[in-house]
């Protein structure tokens, strides 16, 4: 199984890339994380948020791995604990399907994509910069894996 993070946005600051890379390099070979950046749509010319999200949805769908479990990150999603994520990882591994975590653009994710998701997940109740979400998600995936392995990284 492979973990994918599909994120609308590109040209992130160096500290975002460094933080993200720090956690992805710690992941074991059987749970590699691959980032797929989706170029955001411009909101110029009076385009509505709905048309921007629909265009971004098409780009996301084109980048989704075939047959992957979709975990869409959304402010109205379920509030999982790290332990719940740690419990999901082995179940997902047994299932054998790749898992694609989807981070939307500035306007969020298109409702059609959210409806199609296997899991709608909230990473925080606070509003976060999209680049920061990549780092937090990578860290939480590493922490969840470390819990499943009784690795000392997670000490709670």
Swiss-Prot record:
It comes from the Bacteria. Keywords: Cytoplasm, Methyltransferase, rRNA processing, S-adenosyl-L-methionine, Transferase. The keyword S-adenosyl-L-methionine applies. The keyword Nucleotidyltransferase does not apply. GO terms for molecular function: rRNA (pseudouridine-N3-)-methyltransferase activity. CDD domains: RlmH-like. It is an enzyme of class 2 (transferase). It catalyses: pseudouridine(1915) in 23S rRNA + S-adenosyl-L-methionine = N(3)-methylpseudouridine(1915) in 23S rRNA + S-adenosyl-L-homocysteine + H(+). Specifically methylates the pseudouridine at position 1915 (m3Psi1915) in 23S rRNA. Homodimer. This is Ribosomal RNA large subunit methyltransferase H. It comes from Burkholderia ambifaria (strain MC40-6).
